[in-house]
Amino acid sequence: MDGENHSVVSEFLFLGLTHSWEIQLLLLVFSSVLYVASITGNIFIVFSVTTDPHLHSPMYFLLASLSFIDLGACSVTSPKMIYDLFRKRKVISFGGCIAQIFFIHVIGGVEMVLLIAMAFDRYVALCKPLHYLTIMSPRMCLSFLAVAWTLGVSHSLFQLAFLVNLAFCGPNVLDSFYCDLPRLLRLACTDTYRLQFMVTVNSGFICVGTFFILLISYVFILFTVWKHSSGGSSKALSTLSAHSTVVLLFFGPPMFVYTRPHPNSQMDKFLAIFDAVLTPFLNPVVYTFRNKEMKAAIKRVCKQLVIYKKIS
């Protein structure tokens, strides 16, 4: 009976995205450009917020935390996907597969809490401006960050707990380009229908629940601003619209996946590419182009880098 707790499958084989050479080439260029842009954009945001005194505020602290998470989000699956595009045998070790699942759920959990924290930050800024710095103190910001990481890691460990007593002794082919927990459960030697249902409900409930919390909070904020509208609110509303855009980009793909009655493998792959490559790229774009202070800070950072290169 001891063998039931040990996997005899040492690696998993990915079917990948497509067998078309032309589409693979397009995906290689598309994914590589967006990956480099995502890394560069998010590093610029983290560096700008860290070094520029003009951005030392709660809102930008949370934004830098989100960009740090996005650095991980675009690095968990994208590099291997790009590396495997033209490989005939796309494999990942059992440990590598578990690591992918762990980090995917950690990053997803942390990002959800950070988006809630950013919504709360905008609520305080717009509805209680006189108490903003008192409520959104450094201690409060660090508490948000600690809660985000605690819940993210806890959620991921809870998801992985489903795999503890499962044996993988036969098929090892995943119709994907990364390790997805529901697909991995289907490869187990035992009946995992209930486990698949629990995993889907757990992730779907958290995703949909968080989305509606954010939706209600943004509607409440907009209603409050509309009641006390003034010219000084335009800047805050612009920031709020940027937050709303990021929320839609983040929750759109997973909500579509978890709420559909009939999953579609090709559609899931497309949404996974969107989630893994495009969303981390669009986040810094949305926040940068819609925020004058952030654009000014990035320009100052670029000037400093140019001066540093000239000196060196």
UniProtKB/Swiss-Prot annotation:
GO cellular component: plasma membrane
Extracellular side: 1-25, 80-100, 159-195, 259-269
Glycan attachment residues as annotated in the record: 5
Annotated localization: Cell membrane
Stretches in topological domain Cytoplasmic: 50-57, 121-139, 220-235, 290-312
Principal location: membrane
Membrane topology type: Multi-pass membrane protein
Disulfide-bonded cysteines: 97-189
SUPFAM superfamilies found in the cross-reference section: Family A G protein-coupled receptor-like
Transmembrane helix is among the record's keywords: yes
A single GO molecular function term of this UniProt record: G protein-coupled receptor activity
Keywords for this protein: Cell membrane, Disulfide bond, G-protein coupled receptor, Glycoprotein, Membrane, Olfaction, Receptor, Sensory transduction, Transducer, Transmembrane, Transmembrane helix
Highest taxon of the lineage: Eukaryota
Ranges that cross the membrane: 26-49, 58-79, 101-120, 140-158, 196-219, 236-258, 270-289
Database matches in Pfam families: 7tm_4
Family: Belongs to the G-protein coupled receptor 1 family.
Task performed by this protein: Odorant receptor.
PANTHER family, alphabetized: OLFACTORY RECEPTOR (PTHR48002)
Protein name as it appears in the record: Olfactory receptor 4F21
Organism, scientific name: Homo sapiens
Gene: OR4F21
